[in-house]
UniProtKB/Swiss-Prot annotation:
Species per Swiss-Prot/TrEMBL record: Edwardsiella ictaluri (strain 93-146)
Name by which UniProt lists this protein: Exodeoxyribonuclease 7 small subunit
Catalytic reactions of this protein: Exonucleolytic cleavage in either 5'- to 3'- or 3'- to 5'-direction to yield nucleoside 5'-phosphates
Record InterPro entries: Exonuc_VII_S (IPR003761), Exonuc_VII_ssu_sf (IPR037004)
Catalytic activity, EC: 3.1.11.6
Amino acid sequence: MAKKAPAAPAFEQALSELEQIVVRLESGDLPLEEALSEFERGIRLARQGQQTLQQAEQRVKILLSDDQDAPLSPFNAEQE
């Protein structure tokens, strides 16, 4: 059986990890390669968080729309 790719961390978990990365980077104690690796991870987490927030915002807009008969459908961030 093929292994599945690891699931993206939950928003709150990703945010917590991102905050820890920022603290480590701001300390200035990391070697260059490790700092770059942490920075890359932080960028991925920030982008994932932004996408999650955009999807949540779209869901809220749909739920609060005036059209009670409007169908709810999955939001695809790539459509915008």
